[in-house]
From Swiss-Prot:
The keyword NADP applies. Pathway: Metabolic intermediate biosynthesis; chorismate biosynthesis; chorismate from D-erythrose 4-phosphate and phosphoenolpyruvate: step 7/7. It comes from Pseudomonas putida (strain GB-1). Reduced FMN (FMNH(2)). This is Chorismate synthase.
Length: 363
Protein backbone atom coordinates (compact mmCIF):
# COMPACT_ATOMS: atom_id res chain seq x y z
CA UNK A 1 0.00 0.00 0.00
CA UNK A 2 1.56 3.29 -1.04
CA UNK A 3 0.76 6.70 0.39
CA UNK A 4 2.15 5.97 3.85
CA UNK A 5 4.79 8.73 3.83
CA UNK A 6 4.34 12.49 4.24
CA UNK A 7 6.95 15.17 3.58
CA UNK A 8 9.98 15.79 1.37
CA UNK A 9 12.91 16.78 3.60
CA UNK A 10 11.26 15.99 6.94
CA UNK A 11 9.39 12.76 6.31
CA UNK A 12 7.07 10.65 8.42
CA UNK A 13 6.22 7.09 7.42
CA UNK A 14 3.72 5.07 9.48
CA UNK A 15 2.72 1.42 9.53
CA UNK A 16 0.33 -0.70 11.57
CA UNK A 17 -3.34 -1.57 12.01
CA UNK A 18 -5.89 -1.00 14.74
CA UNK A 19 -5.76 -4.59 16.01
CA UNK A 20 -2.25 -5.52 14.96
CA UNK A 21 0.55 -6.08 17.47
CA UNK A 22 1.96 -2.55 17.21
CA UNK A 23 2.15 0.76 15.38
CA UNK A 24 5.40 1.98 13.87
CA UNK A 25 6.79 5.26 12.52
CA UNK A 26 10.03 6.22 10.81
CA UNK A 27 10.86 9.91 11.10
CA UNK A 28 13.61 11.00 8.73
CA UNK A 29 15.31 14.33 8.09
CA UNK A 30 15.39 15.68 11.63
CA UNK A 31 18.56 17.75 12.09
CA UNK A 32 21.10 16.37 14.57
CA UNK A 33 21.52 17.79 18.05
CA UNK A 34 17.86 18.37 18.91
CA UNK A 35 17.21 17.54 22.56
CA UNK A 36 14.39 15.01 22.67
CA UNK A 37 13.08 12.64 25.34
CA UNK A 38 10.32 10.09 25.78
CA UNK A 39 8.51 12.63 27.95
CA UNK A 40 8.40 15.10 25.05
CA UNK A 41 6.57 12.54 22.91
CA UNK A 42 4.45 11.07 25.68
CA UNK A 43 2.94 14.41 26.62
CA UNK A 44 1.04 14.76 23.35
CA UNK A 45 0.26 11.04 23.18
CA UNK A 46 -1.42 11.28 26.58
CA UNK A 47 -3.52 14.18 25.30
CA UNK A 48 -4.71 12.01 22.40
CA UNK A 49 -4.96 8.53 23.92
CA UNK A 50 -8.35 6.78 24.29
CA UNK A 51 -10.25 6.10 27.49
CA UNK A 52 -9.43 9.38 29.21
CA UNK A 53 -13.04 10.49 29.73
CA UNK A 54 -16.57 9.13 29.48
CA UNK A 55 -17.00 11.04 26.22
CA UNK A 56 -14.43 9.01 24.26
CA UNK A 57 -13.93 5.35 23.37
CA UNK A 58 -13.32 3.16 26.42
CA UNK A 59 -10.55 1.23 24.70
CA UNK A 60 -7.71 1.39 27.22
CA UNK A 61 -4.38 1.94 25.51
CA UNK A 62 -1.39 3.29 27.41
CA UNK A 63 0.12 4.50 24.11
CA UNK A 64 3.60 4.30 25.61
CA UNK A 65 6.07 5.16 22.88
CA UNK A 66 9.48 3.55 22.43
CA UNK A 67 12.33 5.27 20.61
CA UNK A 68 14.20 2.60 18.67
CA UNK A 69 16.82 4.66 16.85
CA UNK A 70 18.02 8.11 15.89
CA UNK A 71 18.39 9.43 19.45
CA UNK A 72 21.55 9.03 21.53
CA UNK A 73 22.13 10.46 24.99
CA UNK A 74 19.03 12.61 24.67
CA UNK A 75 19.83 14.19 21.32
CA UNK A 76 18.90 13.38 17.74
CA UNK A 77 21.76 11.96 15.70
CA UNK A 78 20.52 12.99 12.26
CA UNK A 79 19.70 9.36 11.43
CA UNK A 80 16.20 7.94 11.01
CA UNK A 81 14.18 8.00 14.22
CA UNK A 82 12.29 4.75 14.75
CA UNK A 83 9.19 4.87 16.95
CA UNK A 84 7.01 2.03 18.27
CA UNK A 85 3.71 1.89 20.16
CA UNK A 86 2.37 -1.53 21.12
CA UNK A 87 -1.36 -2.27 20.93
CA UNK A 88 -2.48 -3.82 24.22
CA UNK A 89 -6.29 -3.68 24.38
CA UNK A 90 -7.63 -5.14 21.12
CA UNK A 91 -10.99 -6.93 21.19
CA UNK A 92 -11.11 -8.37 17.69
CA UNK A 93 -14.06 -10.65 18.46
CA UNK A 94 -16.27 -7.55 18.49
CA UNK A 95 -15.83 -7.40 14.69
CA UNK A 96 -16.24 -11.05 13.67
CA UNK A 97 -19.93 -10.56 12.86
CA UNK A 98 -19.18 -7.87 10.26
CA UNK A 99 -16.20 -9.39 8.47
CA UNK A 100 -18.29 -9.97 5.32
CA UNK A 101 -20.36 -6.78 5.66
CA UNK A 102 -19.64 -3.18 4.75
CA UNK A 103 -20.25 -0.67 7.53
CA UNK A 104 -21.97 2.46 6.15
CA UNK A 105 -19.65 5.48 5.77
CA UNK A 106 -16.55 3.44 6.63
CA UNK A 107 -13.61 2.50 4.41
CA UNK A 108 -14.68 -1.18 4.32
CA UNK A 109 -16.31 -0.95 0.89
CA UNK A 110 -13.56 1.10 -0.75
CA UNK A 111 -10.68 -0.94 0.72
CA UNK A 112 -12.40 -4.13 -0.49
CA UNK A 113 -12.67 -2.79 -4.04
CA UNK A 114 -9.13 -1.37 -4.07
CA UNK A 115 -7.19 -4.27 -2.55
CA UNK A 116 -9.52 -7.27 -2.71
CA UNK A 117 -8.64 -8.05 0.90
CA UNK A 118 -9.04 -6.07 4.10
CA UNK A 119 -8.40 -6.27 7.81
CA UNK A 120 -11.92 -5.91 9.18
CA UNK A 121 -10.81 -5.72 12.83
CA UNK A 122 -11.50 -2.20 13.97
CA UNK A 123 -11.05 -0.82 10.48
CA UNK A 124 -7.49 -2.11 10.14
CA UNK A 125 -5.25 0.45 8.48
CA UNK A 126 -8.09 2.94 8.02
CA UNK A 127 -8.62 3.25 11.78
CA UNK A 128 -7.77 6.49 13.56
CA UNK A 129 -5.59 4.33 15.80
CA UNK A 130 -2.86 5.02 13.21
CA UNK A 131 -2.80 8.68 14.21
CA UNK A 132 -0.99 7.84 17.45
CA UNK A 133 2.19 7.61 15.38
CA UNK A 134 1.52 10.97 13.75
CA UNK A 135 1.20 12.53 17.19
CA UNK A 136 4.49 10.97 18.30
CA UNK A 137 6.24 12.21 15.15
CA UNK A 138 4.53 15.57 15.46
CA UNK A 139 5.94 15.98 18.96
CA UNK A 140 9.43 15.86 17.44
CA UNK A 141 8.43 18.50 14.90
CA UNK A 142 6.89 20.68 17.62
CA UNK A 143 10.08 20.44 19.67
CA UNK A 144 12.18 21.52 16.68
CA UNK A 145 9.80 24.35 15.76
CA UNK A 146 9.87 25.56 19.37
CA UNK A 147 13.65 25.85 19.09
CA UNK A 148 12.98 28.24 16.18
CA UNK A 149 10.45 30.29 18.16
CA UNK A 150 7.38 28.66 16.58
CA UNK A 151 4.44 27.31 18.58
CA UNK A 152 1.60 25.15 17.25
CA UNK A 153 -1.58 24.96 19.34
CA UNK A 154 -5.15 23.88 18.71
CA UNK A 155 -8.58 23.83 20.28
CA UNK A 156 -12.14 22.70 19.63
CA UNK A 157 -14.16 25.55 18.15
CA UNK A 158 -17.45 23.70 17.60
CA UNK A 159 -19.08 20.43 18.67
CA UNK A 160 -22.25 19.60 16.77
CA UNK A 161 -24.46 22.71 16.94
CA UNK A 162 -22.51 24.23 19.86
CA UNK A 163 -20.09 26.96 18.81
CA UNK A 164 -17.22 27.55 21.23
CA UNK A 165 -15.77 31.08 21.34
CA UNK A 166 -12.06 31.45 22.00
CA UNK A 167 -11.29 32.84 25.46
CA UNK A 168 -7.98 31.52 26.78
CA UNK A 169 -5.32 29.00 25.84
CA UNK A 170 -5.09 28.02 29.50
CA UNK A 171 -8.61 26.58 29.42
CA UNK A 172 -7.81 24.26 26.51
CA UNK A 173 -5.74 21.85 28.61
CA UNK A 174 -8.14 21.89 31.55
CA UNK A 175 -11.06 19.93 30.09
CA UNK A 176 -11.66 16.80 28.02
CA UNK A 177 -12.95 18.78 25.02
CA UNK A 178 -9.94 21.07 24.49
CA UNK A 179 -12.46 23.90 24.85
CA UNK A 180 -10.97 27.40 25.07
CA UNK A 181 -14.09 28.56 26.95
CA UNK A 182 -14.52 26.91 30.37
CA UNK A 183 -18.09 28.15 30.61
CA UNK A 184 -19.06 25.95 27.64
CA UNK A 185 -17.85 22.69 29.20
CA UNK A 186 -21.06 21.85 31.15
CA UNK A 187 -23.12 22.36 27.97
CA UNK A 188 -20.75 20.14 26.00
CA UNK A 189 -20.91 17.42 28.65
CA UNK A 190 -24.72 17.49 28.74
CA UNK A 191 -24.88 17.31 24.95
CA UNK A 192 -22.55 14.32 24.82
CA UNK A 193 -24.44 12.52 27.59
CA UNK A 194 -27.68 12.89 25.64
CA UNK A 195 -25.94 11.79 22.46
CA UNK A 196 -24.86 8.58 24.17
CA UNK A 197 -28.41 7.91 25.31
CA UNK A 198 -29.57 8.46 21.74
CA UNK A 199 -26.94 5.95 20.53
CA UNK A 200 -25.76 8.49 17.98
CA UNK A 201 -22.66 10.50 17.08
CA UNK A 202 -21.78 14.03 16.03
CA UNK A 203 -19.13 16.02 14.18
CA UNK A 204 -16.84 18.82 15.32
CA UNK A 205 -14.60 21.66 14.20
CA UNK A 206 -11.00 22.07 15.33
CA UNK A 207 -8.91 25.22 15.00
CA UNK A 208 -5.11 25.07 14.82
CA UNK A 209 -2.83 28.11 15.12
CA UNK A 210 0.91 28.39 14.46
CA UNK A 211 2.58 31.50 15.86
CA UNK A 212 6.11 32.75 15.31
CA UNK A 213 6.34 31.43 11.74
CA UNK A 214 8.79 33.50 9.74
CA UNK A 215 7.85 34.88 6.29
CA UNK A 216 8.89 32.80 3.32
CA UNK A 217 7.70 29.24 3.96
CA UNK A 218 5.92 27.65 1.02
CA UNK A 219 6.88 26.58 -2.49
CA UNK A 220 4.72 27.91 -5.32
CA UNK A 221 3.06 26.74 -7.39
CA UNK A 222 1.97 23.21 -6.52
CA UNK A 223 3.53 23.12 -3.05
CA UNK A 224 1.90 26.28 -1.74
CA UNK A 225 1.94 26.28 2.04
CA UNK A 226 -1.84 26.43 2.31
CA UNK A 227 -2.16 23.55 -0.16
CA UNK A 228 0.36 21.51 1.84
CA UNK A 229 -1.46 22.23 5.10
CA UNK A 230 -4.78 21.27 3.53
CA UNK A 231 -3.17 18.03 2.32
CA UNK A 232 -1.74 17.26 5.75
CA UNK A 233 -4.92 18.07 7.64
CA UNK A 234 -7.26 16.38 5.16
CA UNK A 235 -5.24 13.18 5.61
CA UNK A 236 -6.57 12.89 9.17
CA UNK A 237 -9.38 10.37 9.57
CA UNK A 238 -12.92 11.83 9.42
CA UNK A 239 -11.79 15.27 8.21
CA UNK A 240 -14.15 16.42 5.45
CA UNK A 241 -13.11 20.03 5.07
CA UNK A 242 -10.24 22.45 5.78
CA UNK A 243 -10.32 26.24 5.86
CA UNK A 244 -7.32 28.56 5.93
CA UNK A 245 -7.97 31.92 7.57
CA UNK A 246 -11.43 33.25 6.73
CA UNK A 247 -11.97 30.22 4.49
CA UNK A 248 -15.46 29.88 3.09
CA UNK A 249 -16.54 33.09 4.83
CA UNK A 250 -14.47 34.84 2.14
CA UNK A 251 -17.35 34.21 -0.26
CA UNK A 252 -19.53 36.79 1.50
CA UNK A 253 -16.76 39.31 2.13
CA UNK A 254 -15.94 42.27 -0.08
CA UNK A 255 -12.41 43.06 -1.12
CA UNK A 256 -12.28 46.08 1.16
CA UNK A 257 -13.03 43.79 4.10
CA UNK A 258 -11.07 40.70 3.14
CA UNK A 259 -7.73 42.24 2.15
CA UNK A 260 -5.26 42.33 5.02
CA UNK A 261 -3.93 45.88 4.89
CA UNK A 262 -0.36 46.63 5.98
CA UNK A 263 0.92 49.51 8.10
CA UNK A 264 4.42 50.16 9.45
CA UNK A 265 3.11 48.85 12.78
CA UNK A 266 1.74 45.61 11.36
CA UNK A 267 -1.11 43.90 9.50
CA UNK A 268 -4.60 45.20 10.28
CA UNK A 269 -6.32 41.80 9.91
CA UNK A 270 -5.58 38.16 9.11
CA UNK A 271 -8.26 36.90 6.74
CA UNK A 272 -5.52 35.16 4.76
CA UNK A 273 -4.67 32.99 7.74
CA UNK A 274 -1.00 33.93 7.62
CA UNK A 275 -0.41 32.80 4.03
CA UNK A 276 -0.23 35.03 0.93
CA UNK A 277 0.41 33.58 -2.51
CA UNK A 278 1.09 30.23 -0.92
CA UNK A 279 3.90 31.67 1.23
CA UNK A 280 3.85 32.44 4.95
CA UNK A 281 3.54 36.15 5.74
CA UNK A 282 4.80 36.10 9.32
CA UNK A 283 1.30 36.39 10.74
CA UNK A 284 -0.24 33.55 12.74
CA UNK A 285 -1.17 30.64 10.50
CA UNK A 286 -4.78 29.68 11.19
CA UNK A 287 -6.57 26.56 9.93
CA UNK A 288 -9.96 25.05 10.72
CA UNK A 289 -10.91 21.39 10.27
CA UNK A 290 -14.41 19.93 9.91
CA UNK A 291 -14.74 16.34 11.15
CA UNK A 292 -17.70 14.16 10.28
CA UNK A 293 -19.77 12.23 12.85
CA UNK A 294 -18.42 8.83 13.83
CA UNK A 295 -19.85 6.16 11.54
CA UNK A 296 -19.61 3.38 14.15
CA UNK A 297 -22.91 3.60 16.02
CA UNK A 298 -25.28 0.98 17.41
CA UNK A 299 -28.28 2.30 15.47
CA UNK A 300 -28.90 -0.14 12.57
CA UNK A 301 -27.85 1.11 9.14
CA UNK A 302 -28.61 -0.28 5.68
CA UNK A 303 -25.75 -1.73 3.66
CA UNK A 304 -24.71 -4.81 1.65
CA UNK A 305 -22.49 -7.84 2.17
CA UNK A 306 -19.58 -8.85 -0.08
CA UNK A 307 -22.02 -10.65 -2.40
CA UNK A 308 -24.20 -7.56 -2.80
CA UNK A 309 -27.08 -8.75 -0.63
CA UNK A 310 -28.93 -6.13 1.45
CA UNK A 311 -28.19 -6.22 5.18
CA UNK A 312 -28.71 -4.14 8.30
CA UNK A 313 -25.45 -3.37 10.09
CA UNK A 314 -25.07 -2.73 13.81
CA UNK A 315 -21.49 -1.83 14.70
CA UNK A 316 -20.35 -3.20 18.03
CA UNK A 317 -17.06 -2.46 19.74
CA UNK A 318 -15.75 0.65 21.48
CA UNK A 319 -15.92 3.89 19.54
CA UNK A 320 -15.73 7.65 19.96
CA UNK A 321 -19.18 9.28 19.78
CA UNK A 322 -17.32 12.38 18.55
CA UNK A 323 -13.90 11.88 16.98
CA UNK A 324 -13.30 15.61 17.26
CA UNK A 325 -12.82 15.35 21.02
CA UNK A 326 -9.42 13.66 20.56
CA UNK A 327 -8.51 15.32 17.25
CA UNK A 328 -6.81 18.47 18.53
CA UNK A 329 -3.38 16.86 19.22
CA UNK A 330 -3.57 15.11 15.83
CA UNK A 331 -4.26 18.36 14.00
CA UNK A 332 -1.43 20.07 15.87
CA UNK A 333 0.91 17.23 14.89
CA UNK A 334 0.10 17.39 11.20
CA UNK A 335 0.47 21.16 11.05
CA UNK A 336 3.80 20.90 12.87
CA UNK A 337 5.07 18.18 10.53
CA UNK A 338 4.10 20.22 7.46
CA UNK A 339 5.68 23.40 8.81
CA UNK A 340 8.92 21.67 9.78
CA UNK A 341 9.18 20.12 6.33
CA UNK A 342 8.73 23.52 4.71
CA UNK A 343 11.11 25.22 7.10
CA UNK A 344 13.86 22.79 6.13
CA UNK A 345 12.99 23.16 2.45
CA UNK A 346 13.11 26.94 2.71
CA UNK A 347 16.51 26.87 4.37
CA UNK A 348 17.88 24.44 1.80
CA UNK A 349 17.08 26.81 -1.08
CA UNK A 350 16.78 30.29 0.40
CA UNK A 351 18.92 30.37 3.54
CA UNK A 352 21.10 33.18 2.17
CA UNK A 353 18.23 35.45 1.06
CA UNK A 354 18.29 38.80 2.87
CA UNK A 355 15.88 41.73 2.43
CA UNK A 356 15.70 45.10 4.16
CA UNK A 357 11.90 45.15 4.45
CA UNK A 358 10.84 44.75 8.09
CA UNK A 359 8.91 41.69 9.22
CA UNK A 360 5.46 42.85 10.29
CA UNK A 361 3.44 41.54 13.16
CA UNK A 362 -0.29 41.89 13.60
CA UNK A 363 -1.89 44.75 15.48
Amino acid sequence: MSGNTYGKLFTVTTAGESHGPALVAIVDGCPPGLEISLADLQHDLDRRKPGTSRHTTQRQEADEVEILSGVFEGRTTGCSIGLLIRNTDQKSKDYSAIKDLFRPAHADYTYHHKYGVRDYRGGGRSSARETAMRVAAGAIAKKYLASQGITVRGYMSQLGPIEIPFKTWESVEQNAFFSPDPDKVPELEAYMDQLRRDQDSVGAKITVVAEGVMPGLGEPIFDRLDAELAHALMSINAVKGVEIGAGFASVAQRGTEHRDELTPQGFLSNNAGGILGGISSGQPIVAHLALKPTSSITTPGRSIDIDGNPVDVITKGRHDPCVGIRATPIAEAMMAIALMDHLLRHRAQNADVKVNTPVLGQL
